[in-house]
Amino acid sequence: VRPLLLLHPFPQTANKCLTPVYYGRYLGFDKAPHMWGGWAEYVYVDLEMLPGTKIYKLPDDMSLRLGALSEPLTSCIRAFNRASRAGGFSWGDTVVIQGSGPIGILAVAAAREMGAGRVICVGAPEEPRLKLAREFGAEATVNIQEIKSPQERIARVREIVGGFGADLVMDCSGHPTAGPEGIEMLRDGGTYVEMGQFTDAGSIETSWHRICTKDLNVLGSWGFTGNDLPLGVDMLYRTRDKYPWLKMQTIYPFTEEGVAQAVKDAMAMKTVKSTIVPWPELVE
């Protein structure tokens, strides 16, 4: 759990500044009293130390397990809203999602709920990730373990999409090679949204000439603001029976062995979302 606790010392906050970086704070367990978040039954929040902190109550009939998906889903919703405000995402658009991890699959669902006409997911492996992406609404998937050449993947996406390319491509993988590949999947005048680089994966080598010649919009999206979070909670609640949300999660106990196995399986892409629970009742 990485709670984004929003402060309000700047006028940009009240004015709904679109960039949360300047006044958002991530809190780790290194700061006293060491109970800011993580795999715990309770979280300590000092409202005097962190004035303006927003706390949202989940609906009474929403499980904590389902509610745990609100944070990553909200990030996806905000990324599409960013594109929409910039004129790069409209009802009926064709969307390509790069990445089939938890963010990628949640982005597939968000794209569907926010009006995308067609959604294609590029990622791996087939089991459990690409199969689940299709269950969440991806019309087609492209397996990068089977189609290993970037040029072949670009050609395959264009074959599926037809015409001149996708209206919007969103990177949810965070891999440095995704950007150069993704912009070639776009139609001229399309929009590329980078939301996968939430850790520094290094420099991305691409020709900016292609961005110019294709007349592209390129946007970055970082996390979400406190005003965005209710959108994620609301979508989960409204569609709780529409999408197989809980199939994303593989449950592990909060033990030394359980945590180690959860991380190991996630790194090996054997799970979509390794979920560590502090007490068994959470999964009932």
Language-model regions, residue ranges each:
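Glycine-rich phosphate/adenylate-binding loop and adjacent beta-alpha elements
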Residues: 1-55
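A glycine-rich, Thr/Ser-enriched phosphate-binding loop motif common to dinucleotide/cofactor-binding enzymes
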Residues: 34-39, 59-84, 95-106
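Short glycine-centered segments of the SAM/dcSAM-binding site in methyltransferase folds
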Residues: 94, 190-191, 217
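Adenosine-nucleotide cofactor-binding segment
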Residues: 94-100, 112-181
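Residues in the short beta-alpha loop(s) of Rossmann-like NAD(P)-binding domains
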Residues: 123-126, 198, 224
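C-terminal hydrophobic helical "lid"/dimerization subdomain
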Residues: 156, 180-184, 225-284
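Helix-to-beta-strand junctions that scaffold the AdoMet/dcAdoMet cofactor pocket
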Residues: 186-188
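Rossmann-fold NAD(P)-binding glycine/threonine-rich loop
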Residues: 196-215, 232-234
